[in-house]
Structures are given as C-alpha cells and as structure tokens.
Amino acid sequence: MSKIFVDACFRKETPYTPVWMMRQAGRYLPEYMEVRAKAGNFLNLCHNPELAAEVTIQPLDIVGVDAAILFSDILVVPNEMGMKLDFLKGEGPVFDKPIKTEADLDALIGGEEAANKLTYVYETIKILKQRLPQDKALIGFTGAPWTLATYMIEGQGTKTYNLCKKMMYSNPEFLHKILRRVTDVVKFYMEKQIEAGVDVVQIFDSWAAAIEPSKYDEFSWKYMVEIAEYLKEKYPHIPVIMFPKGIAAFIERGLVYGNFDVFGVDWGTPMALAKEKLGEKYVLQGNMEPCRLYSKEATTMCVEGIQNIMGGNGHIFNLGHGILPDVPVENAIHFVKECQRVSKKA
C-alpha cells in the first residue's frame, strides 16, 4: 500500500500535503505523560521498546498526523559510544566525562560496534512495523555529527558553545577527529534503522546556527551530506530529510548541496526564500513557528500562507521546530486538520 508521506518525499502526486510535527510524541499529550510515568524517567522510556512504540503511535491516533517518528533521543548515540548520559531535572542532558583530550576520544567505542549496542532502538522499530497502519510511514532519525559533538564536548546543552568553538578555531584537527568518529557510528546506526524497517530518515542539526556560515560546510554540512549520500547509494528507495536549524544565510548564499530528498525549513527561514533557492532540487518540509500553536487563528493564517507559497507537490507540512509541552492538544489537532484542508486536491 502506498504511503502518502513517502510519496510526498519523492514529489509524487498526493491527495493532500501530508503533515507531521517534530516532537509530536511528547509532553503536550497527557497519554504520553502517563506512559513516561510508567517508565520511571525519559531514558527508561527510550530503552523500553514496548513503551517507546506505544508513545510513537499516540500522535497518529490522537492528533491525526500522516507519519510516525520513532520515539528516541539523539544522545543515545554518544551514550552507547561509552559516554554516560543522565537527564537531570532543570538541567537536561548531562555527560559525566566530556571529551577534552585525544585519550578521551580514543576511549570511546566506534563504528558498527557502537551502532550494534542500540538494539532497543531497532527492537522498537520492529514492533512499530507490526502495529502501524500500512499507509502510515515510520521516520527514523539521528542527530547530525556537529550537534552530537556539541554535547560530547560541552558535557551538556549550552548557549555559548565556547568549548566547541575554542576547539574549532584553535584545534580544528581534533574537532574533525571527533566529527569523523561520530559520523562513522551514525552511518551504521541509520543503516541499521533502515534494515529494521523505517521508511524515511531525518538528520537533525539542531545547533547548526552555532557555526558561522563560512564554516558551516566544513564542520557540519559535509558530514551530514556524507551520511545522506552513503544511505542514498545503499537504499535509494528510502527518502532522506535534512533539517539544519538556523542556517538562512547559508541557504541564501546558495551553499546547500548533496544527494538527499527533503530539506527541512526552520521557522526563521522564509519559505519563499527556501523555495527560490532549493525548491527545484528538493522537496521542502515546514515551517510554521511552533508558538503559533497557542492560537488557532494564528495557526490557520500561517498554514494558508505556507500553502499559498508552496502550492501542490514538493512540500510536506511541519513546524519549524518541535511542538512545545504546554500547547493544547486541540490546537495541535487543529493544525493537522488545517494543513490537510487547505492542501486537499479536488
């Protein structure tokens, strides 16, 4: 059976523009909070295939999105490379021993050996393939090497990225060694997600905006493209989505390149600019400002505006970043219904 989301990724004719939301399996859903409480904490939920599959499916049933995205976290990758991960209340993700020296990097597990440790992710995918409706796509994902490296070097989330940037400008060879090690693990990780059954993969570069545009290709984009092209060569039938957040200047300068299918547009990049620079080569995904979900009127206005720019094929509706925890569920449902309404073909 044809999956509308996969068809849209390949610019095929669809009855309407499909829609999903980043972080759609999340804290805005009371049903998600119930399952998370059952798991005990966020990491336990990621490590429990049965419960992770349950929360992955919830947004399809409750909100009506056209695709499911695997419930997991980007930081399971460095965790299985040997960096102990904790989620501390009020602080978010924290690694107990950030990378400071060559010895720290050498101590980590690399390549396929690290990817093989993520069995709970592949098990979740296998459960989902049994339970998802045949017309609904399952999206697998990873963090981009740069975004993963920021946590691995800083030890936690950061507003300044000073340790990463100090390394970027004073010891770029070492930063490239870290990025190479992470890239090699991610390639195997994505391959194993595809082998387990995902229909689409997305690479999230959440902290792309931390890099100045003239350095973005060198320290992030080229590694993302390497992963995408490795996957496209082996699995041409699997769409690859790139989502680098906050790189409007990079887009405007015409610097985006690579063999992938869909470009995720963040809410800070005008959709008209993305269409002008990228729309002929790539399907575009996005890009409503997530805070518009607090108002149904603001949501409808934005959805209609995006539809007016994007028209028919070559587009997937989404937010320009993740849905926030205090958004009313009825407003998320309204967003999905409006996307499907305005794009429905006669």
From Swiss-Prot:
Enzyme Commission (EC) number: 4.1.1.37
GO biological process, one term: protoporphyrinogen IX biosynthetic process from glutamate
Site (Transition state stabilizer): 73
Signal peptide annotation: none
Catalysis performed (reactions): uroporphyrinogen III + 4 H(+) = coproporphyrinogen III + 4 CO2
Pfam families: URO-D
Associated pathway: Porphyrin-containing compound metabolism; protoporphyrin-IX biosynthesis; coproporphyrinogen-III from 5-aminolevulinate: step 4/4
Gene Ontology CC annotations of this record: cytosol
Gene3D superfamilies: 3.20.20.210
Keyword terms of this UniProt record: Cytoplasm, Decarboxylase, Lyase, Porphyrin biosynthesis
Subcellular location: Cytoplasm
Homology family: Belongs to the uroporphyrinogen decarboxylase family.
HAMAP family per UniProt: URO_D (MF_00218)
Subunit comment: Homodimer.
Protein name: Uroporphyrinogen decarboxylase
Organism of provenance: Aliarcobacter butzleri (strain RM4018)
Organism phylogeny: Bacteria, Pseudomonadati, Campylobacterota, Epsilonproteobacteria, Campylobacterales
Primary gene name: hemE
